[in-house]
């Protein structure tokens, strides 16, 4: 599943294609959304927001399209009139004079009013987004030490969208390697220095991945700073200590770590 940096990059691509342009055609696959088609023609997308792995497309009439890609959903940008060759099922089409954005295969799609936006169950549940520029290491540290999270093992906590939205497995693996910890630690047991390092890494690594065009299927980004230090590198030497990186399973997900420098 794409993680926060990939979702934000997808949002950037959608904004670049149609933001501020009048919609000339709107189509939804689901019957409960059909009534919104005519309401949106002539309106425009004001901005595309991410909340962890959910995407919010805001329209000029106050409505917001909520979509969560889950495992299979994918957005595409095409020239208007172009019909991509794909076996995927089209769910949403938002068309402008020159560009069209298409959502395929997703099933978790809703139209929300401003009031519904504040009460939506998923949006209520997710924690602060790691890519929100207003989120600080101090706030992250407070969350780590809060009664709700301080006794949770990092193996599960760093996958829990209620803790911080936008984290996922490759980020969990890279963050824990960066701070030299294994997944069985809890925030309540860390030293002040370890807590500080973790709070910074929880923001720095997702933001670096986003800023340097972090693609999960590329091991190295040409000319960029972000690359996987342990993710998908089992059997290779750790660049920090030389020990061989191992692969195991933590919280039902593949976990990569260095037994030499993660304790």
UniProtKB/Swiss-Prot annotation:
Active site: 2-3, 53, 253
Cofactor: Zn(2+)
GO MF term set: class I DNA-(apurinic or apyrimidinic site) endonuclease activity; damaged DNA binding; oxidized pyrimidine nucleobase lesion DNA N-glycosylase activity; zinc ion binding
Keyword check for Translocase: no
Pfam families: Fapy_DNA_glyco, H2TH, zf-FPG_IleRS
Superkingdom of the organism of origin: Bacteria
Record's keyword annotation contains DNA repair: yes
SMART domains referenced in this protein's UniProt entry, alphabetically: Fapy_DNA_glyco, H2TH
GO biological process, one term: base-excision repair
Binding-site list for DNA: 70, 125, 169
UniProt KW keywords: DNA damage, DNA repair, DNA-binding, Glycosidase, Hydrolase, Lyase, Metal-binding, Multifunctional enzyme, Zinc, Zinc-finger
E.C. no: 3.2.2.-, 4.2.99.18
Zinc finger (FPG-type) in chain: 229-263
Record text on cofactor binding: Binds 1 zinc ion per subunit.
Reaction(s) the record says it catalyses: 2'-deoxyribonucleotide-(2'-deoxyribose 5'-phosphate)-2'-deoxyribonucleotide-DNA = a 3'-end 2'-deoxyribonucleotide-(2,3-dehydro-2,3-deoxyribose 5'-phosphate)-DNA + a 5'-end 5'-phospho-2'-deoxyribonucleoside-DNA + H(+)
Gene3D superfamilies: 1.10.8.50, MutM-like, N-terminal
NCBIfam families documented for this protein: PRK10445.1
Family the UniProt entry places it in: Belongs to the FPG family.
Stated role: Involved in base excision repair of DNA damaged by oxidation or by mutagenic agents. Acts as a DNA glycosylase that recognizes and removes damaged bases. Has a preference for oxidized pyrimidines, such as thymine glycol, 5,6-dihydrouracil and 5,6-dihydrothymine. Has AP (apurinic/apyrimidinic) lyase activity and introduces nicks in the DNA strand. Cleaves the DNA backbone by beta-delta elimination to generate a single-strand break at the site of the removed base with both 3'- and 5'-phosphates.
Entries under HAMAP family matching the protein: Endonuclease_8
UniProt protein name: Endonuclease 8
Name of the encoding gene: nei
């Amino acid at each position: 599943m794409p993680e926060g940096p990939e979702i934000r990059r997808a949002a950037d691509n959608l904004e670049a294609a149609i933001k501020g342009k009048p919609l000339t055609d709107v189509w939804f696959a689901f019957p409960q959304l059909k009534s919104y088609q005519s309401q949106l023609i002539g309106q425009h997308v004001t901005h595309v927001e991410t909340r962890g792995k959910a995407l919010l497309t805001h329209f000029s009439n106050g409505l917001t399209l909520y979509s969560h890609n889950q495992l299979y959903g994918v957005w595409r940008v095409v020239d208007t009139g172009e019909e991509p060759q794909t076996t995927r099922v089209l769910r949403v089409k938002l068309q402008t004079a020159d560009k069209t954005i298409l959502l395929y295969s997703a099933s978790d799609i809703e139209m929300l009013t401003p009031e519904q936006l504040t009460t939506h169950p998923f949006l209520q549940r997710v924690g602060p987004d790691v890519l929100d520029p207003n989120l600080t290491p101090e706030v992250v540290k407070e969350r780590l030490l809060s009664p709700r999270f301080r006794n949770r093992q990092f193996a599960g906590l760093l996958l829990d969208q209620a803790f911080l939205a936008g984290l996922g497995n490759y980020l969990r693996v890279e963050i824990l390697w960066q701070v030299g910890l294994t997944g069985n630690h809890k925030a309540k047991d860390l030293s002040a220095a370890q807590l500080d390092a973790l709070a910074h890494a929880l923001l720095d690594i997702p933001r670096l991945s986003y800023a340097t065009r972090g693609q999960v299927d590329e091991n190295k980004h040409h000319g960029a700073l972000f690359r996987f230090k342990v993710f998908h590198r089992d059997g290779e030497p750790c660049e920090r200590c030389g020990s061989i990186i191992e692969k195991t399973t933590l919280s039902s997900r593949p976990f990569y770590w260095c037994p030499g420098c993660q304790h």
